[in-house]
Amino acid sequence: MNRVIVNGSFDVLHVGHIKLLEYAATFGPVLVLIDSDRRIKELKGPTRPINRLYERITLLRALKSVDEVEVFDSDIELETLIREYSPDIMVKGSDYIGQSIIGACYCNEIKFYDRIEQYSTTKAIQDISSR
C-alpha cells in the first residue's frame, strides 16, 4: 500500500480541502503535515490563522480520509518530516505545478489535484467579512 503525504495550513477547512484529501486517500493512508500557528502568521500575516492549531488538527483528524496529522514550524522541519516518512506519493494542489516543492525529492511521485476555483481560504474569509 502506498504511503501518501499532503501538507498545508488547512485554515478555514473548506470543500476544496476535503476533495483534495479524499483524492489523496484513493492512493493509500494519508499523513497530513500542517503548518504551526506561528508559521501561518509569518507566511500569511498577523490576522492569520483564523482557526488555531488545536482546532485545525481536530477537524483534520475527524475526516475519514486522514490517517495521521503532524505539525511543522519551518521548511527544514517540513523537509525532515517528509524524508523520515518516505512517502510513495505526495499530493499537491494544481497551483503548485511548475513550482519548487519542498521534499519532492523524497517522494516517488507527485500527484496534482485540480484546484476548485470557487473554494479557497482567502475567499471564505472575504465572504465571511463581507456579511
Residue ranges and their predicted role:
Residues 1-131:
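Nucleotidyltransferase catalytic core that binds NTPs
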